[in-house]
């Protein structure tokens, strides 16, 4: 395998097609991120792979199923499965999304948008607090990609996210590709969003690629995680870490998954940018 120069803060998303590669080749990354729900079954083959990889790598658990924006409380079954996974592998981060996916006992296989209202804020913060109390740890909340807006929203997404953090003391997962995609789709400035997010509460950054879909009246950008990180998102990332300091940084790739070497080359790009930052990580995170 080619030699790569990885910064210790850089990781990649571990996906099923790459399990054998990581098991056999063991690239010298410090950490990997998994989709939590894929590893809930303790006797599944994927879980056995994970325990073996955990001997070398730190693991971050990134969830898509807590449905923190649902009026109904978070599923106790889901929470119990998540806690069992956490107890088994001791992850460095546990995260989920600013979204909802369950209503009336029906689960939707997507991360659906919230109206940014006081009512939705109360529901979301209640659910985050309940999850953190159950897990006995802070979780990270990720900003979503967005394609629709609710007319009755009363505040912006970035104000909503900042208020969630303030009320719950959760940490933040900043997805810069999502900011870039949503900024185009809704016509706001990325810097407006990023300057409103409390940088000292950001523990992790996600980088990924997007696709452009042509419509009758223009185009829409879609956060598909199926392409290399775009030049514009690399620039956003460089600007952010130069301003606020280094963070744990993940390369995501979920569709049209390439050879693992392509993923590792993206991780090496992030490593190069991080290596140019002189501010230590400890100096960028203030006490909560």
From Swiss-Prot:
Family note: Belongs to the UPF0276 family.
Descriptive protein name: UPF0276 protein VP3015
UniProt-listed HAMAP family: UPF0276
Pfam families cross-referenced by the UniProt entry: MbnB_TglH_ChrH
Lineage per the UniProt record: Bacteria, Pseudomonadati, Pseudomonadota, Gammaproteobacteria, Vibrionales
Gene3D superfamilies, A to Z: Divalent-metal-dependent TIM barrel enzymes
InterPro entries in the cross-refs: MbnB/TglH/ChrH, Xyl_isomerase-like_sf
């Amino acid at each position: 395998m080619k030699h790569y120069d990885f910064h210790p803060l850089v990781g990649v998303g571990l996906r099923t097609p790459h399990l054998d590669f990581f098991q056999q080749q063991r690239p010298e990354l410090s950490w990997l991120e998994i989709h939590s729900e894929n590893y809930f079954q303790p006797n599944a083959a994927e879980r056995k792979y994970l325990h073996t990889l955990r001997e070398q790598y730190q693991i971050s658990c990134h969830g898509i199923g807590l449905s923190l924006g649902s009026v109904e409380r978070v599923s106790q079954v889901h929470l119990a499965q998540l806690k069992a996974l956490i107890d088994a592998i001791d992850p460095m981060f546990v995260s989920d999304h600013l979204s909802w996916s369950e209503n009336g006992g029906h689960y939707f296989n997507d991360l659906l948008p919230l109206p940014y209202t006081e009512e939705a804020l109360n529901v979301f913060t209640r659910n985050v607090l309940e999850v953190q109390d159950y897990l006995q740890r802070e979780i990270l909340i990720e900003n979503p990609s967005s394609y629709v807006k609710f007319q009755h929203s009363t505040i912006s997404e970035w104000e909503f996210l900042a208020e969630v953090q303030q009320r719950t003391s959760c940490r933040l997962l900043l997805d810069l590709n999502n900011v870039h995609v949503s900024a185009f789709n809704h016509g706001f400035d990325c810097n407006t969003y990023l300057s409103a997010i409390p940088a000292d509460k950001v523990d992790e950054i996600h980088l990924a690629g997007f696709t452009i879909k042509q419509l009758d009246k223009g185009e829409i950008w879609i956060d598909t995680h199926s392409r290399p990180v775009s030049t514009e998102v690399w620039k956003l990332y460089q600007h952010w870490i130069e301003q606020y300091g280094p963070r744990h940084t993940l390369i995501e790739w979920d569709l049209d998954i390439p050879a693992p070497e392509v993923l590792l080359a993206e991780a090496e790009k992030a490593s190069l940018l991080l290596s140019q930052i002189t501010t230590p990580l400890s100096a960028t995170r203030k006490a909560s």
